[in-house]
Amino acid sequence: MEYLTWGRGAKSLLFVQGGPGSFVPQGVLRGLFRREFAAYQEAGYAIWIVTRRRNMPASHTSADMADDYARLIAEEFGGRVGLVVAESFGGMIGQYLAARHPQSFGHIAMVVTAAELSAWGKDVDERMAAAVAAGDAGRAGTVLAEYLLPGPRTRWLRELLGPVVGRRVLDPSGCPAADVLTEARAELAFDARAVLPLIRPPVLLLCGGRDAFFPRTVAEETAELIPDCTLIVYERWGHLRAGSSRRVPRDVLAFVRSR
């Protein structure tokens, strides 16, 4: 597992990033992450962005990845981190972390995630994983552009902007191709409904009201299945807008203070 860390706060924040594929942020993306996490650093947290395990078995599931993070916390953080922020596919892993390893964190926030990915989201992410695994940043960028510009009418614009986006934001060499595909398979097979009632710690779930990957109805179902869940919906926002909003750290820190 590879990592990026900054800040000298006494409390540790572990960020479990989305996927398929997990990377140590570089270049433009690293700057975006630093801005996104500035509020946590100001609140006294040391930030840890940790990738998934490298060279995972092909059969590795989201539950197995949660076990990997729990093992990391046990071995490198003394058995407990102050706060876990788990986003998108990382939030899928976070659901299993909360259910199977509640002692490994003080608080957990799940951002733009839910019990199951939509059919559209599965299709897009499967194509994204194939492009990233092939080392084709341009094609991966074109698929990424579909997050913001879905539908046939904007295909020409996605194909125009995609290669530029891919080269500036994505790093196909940063994660083994086999791991990207393993994460994609785990994502496609993911359905956490059976495990959610087993979660005992309080959970903060933040979702976009117009998220095509994790529709609001599924997010609401997820919150109902978790015994102690606070759901906040950003009504007008989709997946990327909600996940990158400055409201996220504000709401997460308010949740931590309240608990």
Identify the meaning behind each predicted range.
Residues 119-121, 139-186, 195:
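Conserved alpha/beta-hydrolase catalytic His-Asp/Glu region
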Residues 212-218:
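Conserved alpha/beta-hydrolase "acid-adjacent" motif
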Residues 199, 205-207, 211:
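Short beta-strand/loop motif that positions the catalytic acidic residue
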Residues 1-57:
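Conserved HGGG/HGGXW glycine-rich cap/lid loop of the alpha/beta-hydrolase fold
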